[in-house]
């Protein structure tokens, strides 16, 4: 198992490879003018309480005067790729210009020829381990997988993965979404497998599937997925979510109900998300401008305000743009945070998508 502190991961290999000029950052004045001529940007799966996207979208609109069409705000990464494919040749409002997907879905989309390359001006500050060298996709932020717990329902919060099997948590544990298509659920299963001591990759994926089978057989796994609403209602009182989700929900709920956001003691994973431009984007210049905005200091700080860890974190810390007082709301992770290798994630995602139904199925006992 590879364990790395955040800054060590983010400084690993920032050298970039040369690609044709057209894939590099455009002149900003020309890009802004071209984007304004298009007049619109279509995004997908950007919930307003996810990593500060509500404020980021509004700031982008205010800054550049573009209309932003928002599709399926609660959609998963797999749905984003499906939506691109379903709208090839459609230049209307249902065709996304850009996507924000779990890192494992970047290479999948590239392999399916759904993306066009583009390198933002801050390209060299994005770690080589979190980007395609040609610029088809690259990490934008990451979250730390945690347990989000409704304290009105659960008096003693779980501290680690094995605790979830406690009979006290009957009909209490949920995944955040469909693990066959959603990045946060794939990584929930994967992290549970790593916590058993399984080797990274397919072995950890299968160990995680077995763990969730045990949760189901014990009656602890509920059939529904853990949304903000279901957590608040007590329908999914223990849900695996990113740390940013739990903290944001707690702020929005204002103590009704009170929530705990707990980083598992033994092992947890960092979930890197990736931004990319659709090869079939109806508004390609607006898409490039959106990318430039997200990877600028302003955009990266927007992620941090939304309690997600920006991908340019290390460079921005070194330059003093990110200061200690900006990090006080983020839960401590210690040395138990794992940044999974992309090859392991790809294999794990394939195994979980293929074997979830046969191993775990759906619903509680």
Language model features: what each stretch is:
Residues 32, 106, 162-165, 193, ...:
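Non-transmembrane alpha-helical segments in soluble domains
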Residues 24-42, 61-63, 166-168:
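Immediate post-signal peptide segment of exported/extracytoplasmic ligand-binding proteins
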Residues 44-58, 71-85, 92-235, 249:
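Extracytoplasmic ligand-binding site segments that recognize negatively charged/polar headgroups
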Residues 142-145, 209-214, 220, 254-279, ...:
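Periplasmic-binding protein-like
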Residues 20-22:
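N-terminal signal peptide c-region/cleavage motif recognized by signal peptidases
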Residues 1-11:
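Bacterial N-terminal signal peptides that target proteins for export
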Residues 229, 334-365:
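Conserved C-terminal helix/tail region of periplasmic/extracytoplasmic solute-binding proteins
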Residues 269, 273, 278-337:
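Mature extracytoplasmic/periplasmic domains
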């Amino acid at each position: 198992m590879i364990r790395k502190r955040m800054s060590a991961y983010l400084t690993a290999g920032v050298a970039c490879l040369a690609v044709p000029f057209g894939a590099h950052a455009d002149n900003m004045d020309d890009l802004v003018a071209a984007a304004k001529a298009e007049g619109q940007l279509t995004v997908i799966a950007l919930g307003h309480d996810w990593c500060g996207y509500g404020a980021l979208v509004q700031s982008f609109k205010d800054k550049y005067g573009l209309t932003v069409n928002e599709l399926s705000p609660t959609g998963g990464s797999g749905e984003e790729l499906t939506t691109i494919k379903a709208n090839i040749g459609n230049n209307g409002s249902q065709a996304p210009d850009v996507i924000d997907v779990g890192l494992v879905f970047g290479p999948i989309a590239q392999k399916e020829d759904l993306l066009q390359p583009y390198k933002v001006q801050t390209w060299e500050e994005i770690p080589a381990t979190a980007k395609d060298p040609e610029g088809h996709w690259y990490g934008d932020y990451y979250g730390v997988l945690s347990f989000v717990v409704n304290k009105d329902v659960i008096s003693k919060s779980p501290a680690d993965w094995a605790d979830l099997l406690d009979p006290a948590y009957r009909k209490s544990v949920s995944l955040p979404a469909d693990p066959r298509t959603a990045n946060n659920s794939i990584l929930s299963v994967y992290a549970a497998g790593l916590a058993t001591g399984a080797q990274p990759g397919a072995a950890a994926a299968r160990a995680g599937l077995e763990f969730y089978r045990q949760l189901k057989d014990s009656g602890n796994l509920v059939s529904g997925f853990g949304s903000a609403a279901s957590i608040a209602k007590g329908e999914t009182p223990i849900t695996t979510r990113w740390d940013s989700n739990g903290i944001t929900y707690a702020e929005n709920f204002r103590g009704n109900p009170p929530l705990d956001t707990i980083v598992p003691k033994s092992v947890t994973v960092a979930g890197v998300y990736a931004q990319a431009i659709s090869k079939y984007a109806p508004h390609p210049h607006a898409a490039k401008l959106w990318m430039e905005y997200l990877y600028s200091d302003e955009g990266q700080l927007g992620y941090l305000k939304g309690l997600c860890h920006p991908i340019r974190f290390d460079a921005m810390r070194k330059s003093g743009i990110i200061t200690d007082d900006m990090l006080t709301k983020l839960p401590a992770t210690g040395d138990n945070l794992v940044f999974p290798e992309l090859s392991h994630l790809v294999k794990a995602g394939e195994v979980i998508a293929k074997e979830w139904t046969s191993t775990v199925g759906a619903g509680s006992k």
